[in-house]
């Protein structure tokens, strides 16, 4: 590469490594809460104004109410018997990341596709920022082409 290199790891370069255990506890508690299908009290893991930023198909949600009304509740309505299986979780100071899959039954409308009753896998990656014991930011990538292919829709 010629010339100046772009700044790398701008968001995580000054992370406080002493926060790793706290970050891990928050993320593991939140994942357990999602696996238990908690909605009413899941806010204990999120800061008041947290941002949830997903790829196209998910969009960006500001705050818990918007996240729940425009992602968590519709997603749970579309997929029942859902369990999150992280293949790996990584923790570094105030940062955490995971990739894995959710296994679920397609039991409601999702992206315009009527319920099929099929058990599918939903592959994802998550990146979280945790400050003062709460998730402040969550970047999400869901493999929608893979999900839709399992539901009989070829987007390509």
Residue ranges and their predicted role:
Residues 146-154:
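A short, polar/charged loop-to-alpha-helix boundary motif
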Residues 89-97, 129-136:
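A short, structured loop/turn motif at beta-sheet edges
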Residues 2-48, 154-156:
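Short, low-complexity N-terminal intrinsically disordered segments enriched in polar/charged residues
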